[in-house]
Every structure is written in structure tokens, then in C-alpha cells.
Amino acid sequence: MSKRDYYEVLGLSKGASTDEIKKAYRRLAKKYHPDVSKEENAIEKFKEVQEAYEVLSDDQKRAQYDQFGHAGANQGFGGFGGGGDFGGGFGFEDIFSSFFGGGGGRRRDPNAPRQGADLQYQVTLDFEEAIFGKELNVEIPVEDPCDTCKGSGAKPGTSKETCKHCSGSGQVSVEQNTPFGRIVNRQACGHCSGTGQIIKEKCTTCHGSGKVRKRKKINVKIPAGIDNGQQIRVSGKGEAGVNGGPAGDLYVVVHVRNHEFFEREGDHIICEMPLTFAQMALGDEVEVPTVHGKVKLKIPAGTQTGTEFRLKGKGAPNVRGYGQGDQYVVVRVVVPTKLTSQQKDLLREFAGQEEQDDSLFGKLKRAFKGE
């Protein structure tokens, strides 16, 4: 696929001035920036604009391009890297900052209330516990407000002071020279770490952080029907908020141990039931285990291995309360590894007959049951 003309990419004529090239580049880079643009091919267009600017903003590269086209532009310097810096030491982070950071944007109050961080806790349940639900008392490490300083971080009897370097704003102005001129950016004040306040005398308990590490016991109700990998949100049981903000949430991630007999698919429970050849061929009534207790299941004569039977309502309850799953029983014939002489003779007799009568089926059934 041939490359587009660099002037066309920037929407300029070949006689465009350096300032016109810079303005066109800034406008298009902002338009197609991947963090801002919602267009499907924004990344490709952004790279195309960046490549065009890299060539046309350099007098030597531009002269080669004007004379030889793309072949001349690619001679004497490496191909476009896509993720590197812009020409002239002006980086990707700088251009983004000049567009969306700086003095024109809304500044967040460093002392405004902020929600605390969310926490995650892993819990492992038995198969039946996940089916029927459970109530747990879990102990988690959290950061709570310091009782000594009431979360201020300052020694009792003292208070925080306004930072003189940023006048309490938590931000300072930094000037930067760029190809587009001098730009003023705002960044967090290094003296107060962006808080706008200085603690002269720190609390000896929390050392100025305003928080202490504790282990907190929390009651968690596991709903019936929860499945492996699902999580429960316990509102307000995460880390404490900042500056009086609300606490975060606790997310309890559930893991379910495998069962030796049952498997689970959504709200349904699957199991395999081993049966003898005689039971499959002649039919029988068997007891099938379920998580709700044993139930009777009728096996029709002539049932094939792999046949699936449904036990309605014997699965797991839906975790959101939308009904109950079923249990599916898959029957498998178990081929005996040791046969008596009588059993072998009867099987040979069975295999040699075109049509089997009831008397032969009766003999087979009694033989395999040891009667």
C-alpha cells in the first residue's frame, strides 16, 4: 500500500511555512490521539500525522522529500518507529500534556474527599457450600484512620500548615520550551506531595500518614448457588476514605473445590452413573445421589451408554433467585473384567442368536447379579 503525500496528510500545500506545519500537526495530533479519538483507525492516522510532521518539520528531511518523495525521506534516517519520541527531543507525553494538561484544565482540590481503595479477599468453598450458601467471618488487613490523631497525621494538639511553595493548591507551575513555543504545565508540588499542607509535628503513632494497619473481622454472607470465580461485593468494607471520603468496597472472590462425583455447568449439576450390561439391556431402578439426597431413577430396557436422564429441580439454585437448575445423569456401561464360566457361556449364547427371548435375558440378568 503506497504512502500518502505528507503535505496531503497535514492538509497543507508544498509552500507551507514552518508555523503552518506546526499548527496543522497540533490540530491533527489532538484530533486523532488514541486516548481521545473514538474513530476506528485513529491509531493509524495518528501515526501517519506523526510521521509526516517528523519529516516536514526538519529542513534537511523536508528538502530530500520535496526532491525525491518518500524514497528521499527514508534515506539517511531510520524508518518510523511508532512509539518513539518526536523530533527535536519533544516527547509523546509532552504533546499530550500541552493539549490536555497545563494551566487551562480544571485542577482537582488535593484536600477534597476521596473514596478509599477497594480490597479483594479470596475464599475457597466445598461444592455443597457453594450450592447451599454459607455465612463466613473473614479477617482482612485494612488501613483505618489513626485513633491518636483522628486521621490528620499531625501530633495531637497541633495542626497542619499551608504549604508555602504552592500556597495550598498542591500544584506548582513548570515552564517548558517546545517546538510550539513555551508551555506552562501544572504538576504536583514536591514539598507537600500534592496535598497543599505540611505537617510540622507528625503523629508518633502513624508517623504522619493518618492511617494505621489493622486486621478487621467482617461478616460475609455467601449466597446459595454461587459459582467458581464469581465475586461478592461488600459495600463500604474496603480501605478508609481520604479527607472524610467514603470507604472503598470489599470484593470476595469465590473458589469452589472439585467434587469427586458431581460437576457443575451453570445452575445444572452433571454426574455419571455406572451401570452393568444387564441393567442397561434389561432395565432397572437405581438410586442416584444428588446434593439434595438420594432419588430413584428408572432405567428403561435397552438403554444405551451415554444416555442422559434429567432430574428436574435437583441442581443448584440460581444465585440471583431465578429458579433452580436440574441434575443430569449420564449412564455408562461398566464392562466386567472378570467373568465366571457360566457368564461367558451365556454371553456366547447371546452373541450367537439372531433374536433373544425373555428366557435368555432372564438367565443373563441372574448370571450378572450372581444369582
Curated annotation (Swiss-Prot):
Pfam family, any one: DnaJ_C
Gene3D superfamilies in alphabetical order: 6.20.20.10, DnaJ domain, Urease metallochaperone UreE, N-terminal domain
Keywords tagged on the record: Chaperone, Cytoplasm, DNA replication, Metal-binding, Repeat, Stress response, Zinc, Zinc-finger
One BP term from GO: DNA replication
Cross-referenced InterPro entries: DnaJ (IPR012724), DnaJ_C (IPR002939), DnaJ_domain (IPR001623), DnaJ_domain_CS (IPR018253), HSP40/DnaJ_pept-bd (IPR008971), HSP_DnaJ_Cys-rich_dom (IPR001305), HSP_DnaJ_Cys-rich_dom_sf (IPR036410), J_dom_sf (IPR036869)
Residues reported in the UniProt entry to bind Zn(2+) 2: C163, C166, C189, C192
MF terms in GO: ATP binding; heat shock protein binding; unfolded protein binding; zinc ion binding
Positions of CR-type zinc fingers: 133-215
Gene Ontology CC annotation, any one: cytoplasm
Listed cofactors: Zn(2+)
Compartmental location: Cytoplasm
HAMAP family: DnaJ
Subunit structure: Homodimer.
Cross-referenced PANTHER family: CHAPERONE PROTEIN DNAJ, DNAJ HOMOLOG 1, MITOCHONDRIAL-RELATED
Protein name, entry field: Chaperone protein DnaJ
